[in-house]
Design a protein with these regions (language model features):
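A glycine- and charged-residue-rich anion-binding loop/surface
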Residues: 1-300
Length: 300
């Protein structure tokens, strides 16, 4: 296929940004420290590469360029993280006000804040483009990132629906540049809240079941959770694979993604070429999870 040599544009953030200072480390482009930040990549497309290794000049040549917009902003604004730029300032402030934490407390436990703000922004743009939460393809991606944002919100004490409030900050900031966000504002806020409520109905039972499975893994000294069991968690409780994997990795374990996908494909084939996938992990899962939770509460 088309290819060619490339060049990378790096920015020297200064010696003070070398996170390995005081060691025998020597700074260098594409080195191990954080002093040099890659901002830009240019690929000079001028050849066609064949399977046998031959290179033939292309009749038309061009430059394929990729620039990290958020990295450019972080350099211009003199901050050490994309999440400390004004691109995320509004949503971070809303999130911090909801938690009641100080700025220092937020920065000391920054990962949940970053995940929520990143995922809510992504979900807002997806919904504005007509991609609502679902169980297949891009709709599954929307569902997964919304539910993952909700789970990370719970890590900072946010257990009631809150994603729409963060999304409103996203719309307020980006809306003048992307008017489709303002146009789709009702759909964005509604879909986020409904998906968050749906997930809350199932996540407690699903994560409790997952914790039991992970405890069994530890007792058997096995580091990998069977993907089929992870699929059962999704089919029964609506717990996305990515969240099961997050929880497992937090405990030094992992989930077999290949086996998960095989179980998902097998289910699709058994249910008529995937026609039943629309309900998988959705309202049916919520219904059965509610019944199971009620039975567990009664000691049955």
């Amino acid at each position: 296929g088309p290819c060619g040599p490339c060049s990378e544009i790096h920015f020297d953030l200064g010696e003070e940004r070398d996170n390995l200072r005081g060691t025998d480390h020597v700074c260098g482009v594409n080195g191990e420290c954080t002093r040099y930040l890659e901002l830009w990549n240019n690929v000079f497309i001028q050849y066609n590469l064949f399977d046998d290794g031959r290179l033939e000049p292309l009749p038309q040549k061009h430059v394929d360029t990729g620039m990290g917009f958020e990295r450019i902003v972080s350099v211009l604004q003199g901050v050490d993280s994309n999440y400390k730029t004004d691109l995320f300032a509004g949503s971070l402030e809303v999130l911090r006000s909801l938690t009641g934490q100080s700025e220092k407390e937020m920065l000391d436990n920054f990962t949940p804040y970053r995940v929520v703000c990143d995922h809510v922004r992504s979900a807002a743009f997806l919904i504005a483009d007509g991609v609502v939460p679902g169980n297949a393809g891009r709709n599954y991606v929307a569902r997964m990132i919304i539910r993952r944002a909700a789970r990370f919100g719970s890590k900072i004490g946010l257990n009631d629906p809150f994603l729409a409030k963060v999304a409103q900050a996203v719309i307020n900031y980006y809306g003048d540049f992307y008017p489709e966000l303002k146009k789709a504002q009702p759909a964005i806020l509604d879909n986020l809240t409904r998906e968050e409520i749906r997930f809350a109905r199932t996540v407690e039972a699903g994560t409790a079941h997952l914790e039991n499975l992970l405890a069994d893994l530890k007792s058997s000294n096995s580091p990998i959770l069977d993907g089929g069991k992870a699929f059962d968690l999704y089919a029964t409780y609506g717990l996305p694979f990515e969240i099961s994997r997050d929880i497992a990795r937090e405990q030094g374990l992992d989930v077999d993604e290949i086996a998960f996908n095989e179980a998902k494909e097998k289910h699709a084939l058994a249910s008529g070429g995937g026609k039943a996938m629309g309900k998988l992990g959705g309202e049916d899962a919520e219904f059965f999870a509610e019944i199971l939770k009620d039975l567990q509460g009664k000691g049955k």
